[in-house]
Each structure stands twice: as structure tokens, then as C-alpha cells.
Amino acid sequence: MSFSGHTARKRFGQHWLRDARVLDQIVEAARLQQDDRVLEVGPGRGALTERLLASPAAQVHAIELDRDLVQGLHDRFGTDTRF
């Protein structure tokens, strides 16, 4: 599944964080260690998820309510054993 064509849904309060600088600042501020577990609520298209999985965090758990986005997240990150 591709995320293209999926628009943010007001009922979920969705917006897409795309600014690479802001995403990097979030991960940097978290100061993640190898044994940390991260819970990401509302990963959307996975922009932050991607950076979290590139960090030293042990695991990244993501909860997405929009069923239209779940398969895309699984397709994109499902092979990573830390996701």
C-alpha cells in the first residue's frame, strides 16, 4: 500500500509532520538508549517512526487509529524486528 493520495482526516486530528529538522530534533531530545522502548501514538505515514527505528532504541511500538494507514506502516516497517 502506498500513502500517496491519503489525506489527513480531521476526525482523527491528523497532520503530517514532514520537516526533517523538527523530526531530527524530536529524536535527539529523546536521548534514546539501547534498552529504551518507544511508544509512538499516531505515527501517520511513519516519518518519525523511520527516525526512531534508526536510533539506538530497542523497540518502537506504534498505535495508529486510522485503519487506512496501518497496512502502509506494516508494509514499510514490518520487516524490522524492533517495530
Feature roles, as predicted:
Residues 1-83:
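Catalytic cores of RNA-modifying enzymes
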